[in-house]
A protein has these predicted regions:
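N-terminal glycine-rich anion-binding loops that anchor highly charged ligand groups
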Residues: 27-45, 68-73
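Short glycine-rich or small-residue beta-strand-to-loop segments that form or flank ligand, phosphate
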Residues: 52, 75-86, 171-172, 377-383
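An acidic, phosphate/nucleotide-engaging active-site surface
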Residues: 119-174
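C-terminal non-catalytic interaction/assembly regions of soluble proteins
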Residues: 294-457
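Short, conserved secondary-structure transition motifs
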Residues: 108-126, 357-359, 417-427
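Gly/Ser/Thr-rich loops at beta-strand to alpha-helix junctions
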Residues: 12-14, 39-41, 82-92, 176-182, ...
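Short acidic, glycine/serine/threonine-rich loops at helix termini
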Residues: 17-20, 44-48, 89-95, 121-131, ...
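Small-residue-enriched flexible segments
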Residues: 1-9, 15, 34, 76, ...
Length: 457
């Protein structure tokens, strides 16, 4: 029976895995080692700035173990969404780390670097041709959005990975790509049923995340065959059951029954999850419908401004009883003070926001719980067109806030406790995601290029 054995090293490169688990998994003779290295979960900063979620040391530790294991077994190592967002600077950063490891460990391999960063001129042409369309709740999109974007990436499907593997790449490091494409490319290339492959890839994408209780990041392992796959964690402390595996279909997904990929849609409505031991689950019954139109999702981020924040807490029960009105009056007083210092023209050039921890900081207006405890935390945030301006405005806010009165108290009061001195904390540049759109390329490879390199030879 044809099968592909897949080792998922971890949920996101840099978050770690246990070395002994990797060794145990290698004893199961995987056909390749894969790991995602990115996500939009940490927000737009990483795509906008090119920074990375983890340190170079964290990436190097994980990638070193993967490369050593992969080269010893002569199997490919495949990494997607390099260094968080998969932009060109982040791709080059991870490729550089791979080169350093090869030099230090005296390894040699053929490396494929898949570029996902998009040319702005190309996107403008596609926009004029009507080849860029919005997804649900997409913001407005025009050439100005393209121009303002610090980086724009396309989320690659399996095709760039397949091309790299067919060209003999032993290590593949990709820019932005769908998490599942990392694990689907080789099995689909080898002719396995796409429905089974894509479903297995969805379960493997986050390493050990589909176990019953994941206490720390670690490896996962699956055997993929035409009509089913079996997932069993190589860490003996972990186990999967049907509920833990099935529930992972909801992770980063609006529905547990459909997963949209560039080439089609995985449907898990008829999937069956069967415990074949106290640690392993057999999954079968999914279907895959090929898309009528091949599309690539775009991700972009633009500079929203520069921020400064203040963290404080309020414990006075008199203030807490009238917290909403007190904060509204405080905010108005702070804005009036800013206008007095900088002139009326300052209005509209900055934003002052307040978040209340212990009231509705997580859910905002969707919060159903109305009770407030004995204290709350406050986060004041100013966003302006420069760091100097944001910090300066926050200095005015901090002084107004710390002594803002309530009618029940006479004289000067101190209403907020600040844990830091100075109270205002510069946060640097702040970015926002600015697109939720797909492109219809002329071919699956039109938006991606691959650089090949013989490393260590």
């Amino acid at each position: 029976m044809k099968e592909i054995r897949i080792l998922s090293a971890t949920g996101i490169l840099g978050s770690g895995f246990r070395e002994e688990t990797l060794k145990r998994a290698m004893g199961l003779e995987p056909h390749f080692i894969g790991a995602d290295s990115g996500s939009t979960d940490p927000g737009p900063h990483y795509l906008g700035s090119g920074d990375t979620l983890f340190s170079d040391s964290a990436y190097k530790r994980d990638l070193r173990l993967m490369l050593l294991a992969g080269r010893a077994a002569k199997i490919p190592v495949i990494v997607g969404s390099a260094c968080t967002s998969g932009s060109d600077p982040q791709l080059e950063r991870l490729v550089g780390i791979a080169r350093d490891i090869a030099r230090e460990e005296k390894l040699s391999f053929k490396l494929a670097a898949i570029h996902s960063e998009q040319d702005k001129g190309y996107l403008k042409r596609k926009l004029r041709e009507g080849k860029i369309t919005p997804l649900a709740n997409a913001p407005d999109f025009d050439e100005g959005v393209i121009d303002r974007s610090a980086h724009i990436v396309g989320m690659a499907g399996i095709e760039p990975f397949v091309e790299a593997l067919e060209h003999g790449a032993e290590v593949v490091i990709a820019g932005r790509s769908s998490d599942t494409s990392i694990f689907s490319a080789m099995p689909v290339m080898r002719g396995l049923n796409p429905a089974t492959v894509w479903h297995a890839a969805k379960i493997l994408e986050c390493g050990a995340a589909c176990v019953v209780l994941r206490k720390y990041p670690d490896c996962n392992f699956a055997i993929v065959r035409d009509d089913h796959f079996i997932v069993e964690p190589p860490n003996p402390e972990y186990r999967c059951d049907p509920d833990s595996v099935a529930s992972h279909n909801l992770y980063e997904n609006s529905t547990p029954y459909e997963l949209v990929e560039p080439s089609g849609v995985l449907n898990t409505y008829s999937a069956r999850y069967e415990a074949i031991s106290d640690r392993a689950v057999k999954v079968s019954g999914s279907t895959f419908k090929t898309a009528e139109r091949y599309t690539i999702k775009l991700e972009g981020a633009e500079l929203a401004g520069y921020q400064a924040i203040i963290i404080g807490s309020v414990r006075d029960p008199i203030i807490l009883r009238q917290l909403d009105s007190w904060l509204a009056d405080l905010t108005k007083a702070a804005k009036d003070r800013i206008a007095a210092v900088y002139g009326a023209g300052i209005e509209g050039t900055y934003r002052l926001d307040v978040r209340v921890f212990g009231k509705n900081a997580t859910m905002g207006p969707l919060e159903s719980e109305t009770a407030i405890g004995h204290e709350v935390g406050l986060l004041f945030q100013v966003t302006a067109d420069s760091q100097e301006r944001a910090t300066a405005l926050m200095k005015s806010v901090s002084h107004i806030a710390v002594h803002y009165p309530v009618p029940e108290w006479t004289g000067l009061i101190t209403s907020i406790a600040y844990p830091y001195s100075p109270a205002e904390i510069p946060r640097g540049p702040s970015y926002r995601f600015n697109m939720n759109h797909v492109v219809a390329p002329a071919s699956p490879m039109e938006m991606f290029s691959i650089d090949y390199e013989n490393v260590g030879h």
